[in-house]
């Protein structure tokens, strides 16, 4: 498939332990294509030679081989949980707009980082330009500005933010018609402290 072709090319250029690609119709959520790496041959599903060298295979215990096979057979698109990363930003903005803690014309000065408790969360601009400077809400989304989103989340507060996560379906199964679907990882309020 086209997806698998590009996935193999990507992994040759930037080797990874696993890769998951899902192509969806953004209008209705229909899955148009899906691929997972590493791949295995359905005609020879126990062949690990495409993933491990002869030396690596020779040094593996039976348990290691079994675990390697399970990893090889895993559909990483549905059976693993991943942090949503910047795809979370539109949901943060939507919650902020709905609750009135941010408005379309609002600006925020990105200094390149924001502290959440003791942790410094950097903006991707931190290593290049240091910061985005003053941004509108639209520019914050366009530039994927982490500090602006943190500012919105702080204004929402942990309880409201967690309520919106639940309303948007984060942490829940999608109901895809494939076996082994994992749920997302969500922290309960007891594990989240106010900044």
Regions found by a protein language model. Give the residues of each.
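Beta-lactam-recognizing serine transpeptidase/beta-lactamase-like catalytic domain environment
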Residues: 19-21, 26-87, 91-193
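Conserved, well-ordered alpha-helix/loop/beta-strand core segments that scaffold catalytic motifs
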Residues: 1-19
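Surface-exposed, proline-anchored Ser/Thr-rich loop/turn motifs
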Residues: 4, 194-195
């Amino acid at each position: 498939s086209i997806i698998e072709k590009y996935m193999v090319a990507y992994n040759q250029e930037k080797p990874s332990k696993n890769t998951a690609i899902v192509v969806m119709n953004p209008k209705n959520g229909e899955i148009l294509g899906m691929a997972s790496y590493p791949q295995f041959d359905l005609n020879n599903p126990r062949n690990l030679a495409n993933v491990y060298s002869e030396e690596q295979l020779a040094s593996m215990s039976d348990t290691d081989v079994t675990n390697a096979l399970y990893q090889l057979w895993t559909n990483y698109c549905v059976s693993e949980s991943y942090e949503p990363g910047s795809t979370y930003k539109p949901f943060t903005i939507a919650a902020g707009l709905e609750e009135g803690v941010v408005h379309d014309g609002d600006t925020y000065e990105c200094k390149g980082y924001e502290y959440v408790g003791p942790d410094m969360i950097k903006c991707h601009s931190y290593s290049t330009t240091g910061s985005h400077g003053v941004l509108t809400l639209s520019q914050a989304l366009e530039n994927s500005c982490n500090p602006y989103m943190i500012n919105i989340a702080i204004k929402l507060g942990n309880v409201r933010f967690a309520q919106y996560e639940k309303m948007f379906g984060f942490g829940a199964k999608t109901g895809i018609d494939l076996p082994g679907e994992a749920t997302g990882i969500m922290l309960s309020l007891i594990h989240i402290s106010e900044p």
